[in-house]
Amino acid sequence: MLFYCEFTWFPGTSRADVARRVVQQHDAGANNPERIHGWYNLVGGGAGFLLVDYDDPAELTAFLQPYMDLMSFDVRAVTQNTYGETIEGLREVAAQTT
């Protein structure tokens, strides 16, 4: 399942703090890069989001926990919509409710 993991650094967290932790987790083999489908930082720094693929929410939690002293997370399961199919489905819903 695909998860959207929005993160915001806690006040006082520095770029160096985050860099050290990310590299530490990478070197330990704990970042699971094959599960990361996207990693985006917001302009201005200190926030962003990951798109990650996990079947087990407990595994996702274990992936995020080493960072939880540096940043907060808002995690949501997401699904992908195909535009054309979604429009057709919405047409059907709209027709039923009028």
Segment roles from a protein language model:
Residues 44-47, 68-70:
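Short connector loops at helix/strand junctions that flank enzyme active sites
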Residues 21-23, 60-69:
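Short amphipathic alpha-helices in soluble, non-transmembrane regions
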Residues 53-54, 66:
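Conserved catalytic core of Hanks-type protein kinase domains
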Residues 1-31, 35-46, 55, 80-81, ...:
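Short S/T/G/P-rich N-terminal loop/turn motif that feeds into the first structured element of a domain
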Residues 54, 59-60, 73:
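Generic hydrophobic/packing signal
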Residues 5, 50, 60:
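Hydrophobic pocket/interface hotspot
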Residues 70-81:
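Conserved short beta-strand edge segments in small beta-sheet-based binding/regulatory domains
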